[in-house]
Amino acid sequence: MKIKGVIGLALGVVLGASAASAAEVTVVRDVLGPEGPVLVDGALYYVGWVSGTLSKWDGAKSVVLNNLSGCGHNGLALTARKTFLLACTDDPGSVLEMDMTGKLLRRWNADATGRPFKGGINDVVVTANGGAYATLWGPSTDLPTAVIGGVLYLAPGARDWGQVADGLDYANGVAVSPDQKTLYVSETVGNIMQTYTINADGTLSNRSNFALLNLLTKNRVDSWWLGPDSMKVDAKGNIYVAQWFGGKVLKLSPQGKLLHEFDIAAGDGTTNIAFSEDGNFLYVTVVKDPNDPQARGSIVKIPNVE
């Protein structure tokens, strides 16, 4: 999640939240704009959108692998080639491909027609066949304005991205079902999640409303920006979505039913999730105060639930 200036001031009083798990442990501190956690071979990779960094935590210490201005590091995904795709939210946005050491291998600044990625790229996910989807965000202003969000697709072996969905209100997180037939997309403005059918050629159809989060959980504050951020899907097809300004992670069934609510004590700006290798724990990136322009935050580890 990245919003320039004052980050969407909340207009209401914070609602009482259920007690956070006593087992919540902070594993990484002092991250400026924590996002994009990915666990690879026991190491946790993550980004800072304010610091413009890609870092690696080995269980004891963090090392910065990449420090690149003009990107606004955000979503991160691992490819089958053991490279990273990185979403850049600076407007216009970019998608970067980097090796595991943070070395830049490739940069896309426009789609196949030459159109710049207006609104910035927010998140990215890799499919089982080697393709990838990325979300187009929107103007990073104090209050949301133009509805220009969409979804881009990079087909396996293709040179360029093509747009496969539009008309989304600040498209944010993106994820794929285990059977590779459904694409989940979060619209932060509106506090809603959408689904699409993934066609054989990677195009999308049958856009449908999946979950309206304020019907599943009480809003913690009144804010334009309270809504779903990034998400991950487990092997059973359950969706774990971070709620920006909500201070929580929601576990949803493939049918959109709320299965569990994880309240995060470390802050209200939950942004993303990674699973431990055995699936028994979640690593959650969280900003303490979403109104903080520096987006000071951390990564916490919490137990998962069945």
Task: Go through each PLM region and give its residues.
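Beta-strand initiation motifs
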Residues: 21-24, 60-63, 102-106, 154-162, ...
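Beta-rich, blade/repeat-based domains predominating
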Residues: 29-42, 49, 68-88, 94, ...
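Bacterial N-terminal signal peptides
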Residues: 8-17
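Beta-propeller domains
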Residues: 45-67
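Short loop/turn segments immediately following beta-strands, especially the blade-tip
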Residues: 196-203, 303-306
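Short glycine/acidic-enriched loop and turn motifs that connect beta-strands
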Residues: 51-53, 91-93, 139-142, 190-192, ...
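A short loop-to-beta-strand structural motif that recurs across blades of beta-propeller domains
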Residues: 53-55, 94-96, 149-152, 192-194, ...
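Bacterial N-terminal signal peptides that target proteins for export
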Residues: 1-8
